[in-house]
């Protein structure tokens, strides 16, 4: 493995860790309605489990409601069941093939718990970044040991790996700060 490939590989892994964080944070409920809230909902449909988005269209008519328009009448009860099983704290209100999900306002206690969870996700991501950095530094030591790079170059590349880690760590901080503001906004 050469040094350019190593840097690119580390950057891809760090980017992936950031994407995982984004995905986890989308699942956190803020006071505002968002169809992303239903990403984790699966529905028993036609003999298998399917994502909700494959059996219904999702929309947010206002800041406190998510509408689920089920395409097949026979699927309405399965969709309701899937939403209930997902344990999102939402109560489906059915009107024909339209299921309305009113988003209850978050209590201060719940907001604080969600912020703590967001910080935990952020810390887990930073741990992943540090593990990626460690793997990168070990690979650099191996390259130096195998005489592929000189000691000076090893030091320089190791600083670049640290800078990359710091950059992604600050991105994690800003994403968490933004999510915290989103959660705490009443």
From Swiss-Prot:
The keyword Protein biosynthesis applies. One of its GO terms (molecular function) is ribosomal large subunit binding. CDD domains: RRF (cd00520). One of its GO terms (cellular component) is cytosol. SUPFAM superfamilies: Ribosome recycling factor, RRF (SSF55194). The keyword Protein biosynthesis applies. Keywords: Cytoplasm, Protein biosynthesis. It is found in: Cytoplasm. It holds the Pfam family RRF. Its main location: cytoplasm. Responsible for the release of ribosomes from messenger RNA at the termination of protein biosynthesis. May increase the efficiency of translation by recycling ribosomes from one round of translation to another. Belongs to the RRF family. PANTHER family: MITOCHONDRIAL RIBOSOME RECYCLING FACTOR PSEUDO 1, RIBOSOME RECYCLING FACTOR. This is Ribosome-recycling factor. It comes from Rickettsia conorii (strain ATCC VR-613 / Malish 7).
């Amino acid at each position: 493995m050469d040094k350019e490939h190593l840097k690119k590989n580390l950057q891809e892994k760090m980017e992936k860790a950031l994407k995982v964080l984004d995905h986890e944070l989308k699942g956190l409920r803020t006071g505002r309605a968002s169809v992303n809230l239903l990403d984790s909902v699966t529905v028993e449909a036609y003999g298998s489990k399917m994502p909700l988005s494959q059996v219904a269209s999702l929309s947010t008519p206002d800041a406190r409601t998510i509408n689920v328009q089920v395409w097949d009448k026979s699927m309405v009860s399965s969709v309701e069941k899937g939403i209930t099983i997902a344990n999102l704290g939402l109560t489906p209100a059915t009107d024909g093939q339209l299921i309305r999900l009113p988003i209850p306002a978050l209590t201060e206690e719940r907001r604080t718990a969600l912020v703590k969870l967001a910080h935990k996700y952020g810390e887990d991501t930073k741990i992943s970044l540090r593990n990626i950095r460690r793997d990168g530094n070990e690979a650099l030591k191996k390259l130096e040991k195998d005489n592929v790079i000189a000691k000076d170059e090893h030091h320089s590349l190791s600083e670049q790996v640290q800078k990359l880690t710091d950059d992604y760590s600050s991105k994690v901080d800003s994403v968490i700060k933004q999510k915290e503001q989103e959660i705490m906004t009443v």
